[in-house]
Amino acid sequence: MKIGIIGAMEPEVAHLIAAMTNTSSQTIADIEFIAGTLAGKDVVVTRSGIGKVAASIATTLLIEKYAPDAVINTGSAGGFVDSLSIGDIVISSEVRHHDVDVTAFGYEIGQMAQQPAAFIPAPYLVEAANKAIAQLGEVRAIEGLICTGDSFICDPVRTKTMLEHFPTMAACEMEGAAIAQVCHQFGVPFVVIRSLSDNANNDSPVDFDAYIVKAGYHSALMVMLLLEQLEPNSVK
């Protein structure tokens, strides 16, 4: 079993890379891919860069060059659930674009033309993530809708509009739906795991800078615990 792991920024992958053994790396299109062993599994970890285009490029290269059995997207997100605090975790129950609008042609808000409205993670990966939750100590985790767009959300007016469109949204970020869409088209199972770095409000820029390292650590810890739950025949 080989697992691809994608984070957008250095703090989101640094703990994973530091824990890897037997590593080798190559750089393609200015994106470094580090192969090795983590939690007893063969993995390839990459820092994609920020945003949907960067994430799509990295995911496509990862799948084409390394043929992973599954892809995990790890990192930080802005939170929309009152019961969660900075550092807590959202496991994707589904992933959607929040900045896509082709409703004039009969699609749902957030649905890209000729694509599903929501991208659904592999149940076995979500199950493994839920088993890992019990080992997280004081860190809380829930399953929920994660939405993606090419904007850092820190405007209450925009937040209100997003919640009108996606009332069950638990978190928003800038890569997950792009990664999910690429995985969908290649037929590769995926899951998105995000730790909250801010609460998508006026304080978000300050919160993000202060808490990105904490969020990156918690998300990386969740990924490593998830990997420990996977058996060689887990892929479905």
UniProtKB/Swiss-Prot annotation:
GO cellular component assignments: cytosol
Keywords of this entry: Amino-acid biosynthesis, Hydrolase, Methionine biosynthesis
* Gene3D superfamilies hit by this protein: Nucleoside phosphorylase domain
Give yes or no: UniProt keyword Amino-acid biosynthesis: yes
Pathway noted in the entry: Amino-acid biosynthesis; L-methionine biosynthesis via salvage pathway; S-methyl-5-thio-alpha-D-ribose 1-phosphate from S-methyl-5'-thioadenosine (hydrolase route): step 1/2
Organism ancestry: Bacteria, Pseudomonadati, Pseudomonadota, Gammaproteobacteria, Alteromonadales
List the Pfam families hit by this protein, alphabetically.
PNP_UDP_1 (PF01048)
Write out the GO MF terms.
adenosylhomocysteine nucleosidase activity; methylthioadenosine nucleosidase activity
Q: What is this protein called?
A: 5'-methylthioadenosine/S-adenosylhomocysteine nucleosidase
Which GO BP terms, alphabetically?
L-methionine salvage from methylthioadenosine; L-methionine salvage from S-adenosylmethionine; nucleoside catabolic process
**Role:** Catalyzes the irreversible cleavage of the glycosidic bond in both 5'-methylthioadenosine (MTA) and S-adenosylhomocysteine (SAH/AdoHcy) to adenine and the corresponding thioribose, 5'-methylthioribose and S-ribosylhomocysteine, respectively. Also cleaves 5'-deoxyadenosine, a toxic by-product of radical S-adenosylmethionine (SAM) enzymes, into 5-deoxyribose and adenine.
Q: Quick one: which residues bind substrate?
A: G78, I153, M174, E175
The similarity annotation says:
Belongs to the PNP/UDP phosphorylase family. MtnN subfamily.
PANTHER family with a match to the protein in the record? 5'-METHYLTHIOADENOSINE/S-ADENOSYLHOMOCYSTEINE NUCLEOSIDASE (PTHR46832), 5'-METHYLTHIOADENOSINE_S-ADENOSYLHOMOCYSTEINE NUCLEOSIDASE (PTHR46832:SF1)
User: Which InterPro entries does the entry mention?
Assistant: MTA_SAH_Nsdase, Nucleoside_phosphorylase_d, Nucleoside_phosphorylase_sf
Catalytic activity entry: S-adenosyl-L-homocysteine + H2O = S-(5-deoxy-D-ribos-5-yl)-L-homocysteine + adenine; S-methyl-5'-thioadenosine + H2O = 5-(methylsulfanyl)-D-ribose + adenine; 5'-deoxyadenosine + H2O = 5-deoxy-D-ribose + adenine
Please give the superkingdom of this protein's source: Bacteria
EC number, as in UniProt: 3.2.2.9
- Which catalytic residues are annotated? E12, D198
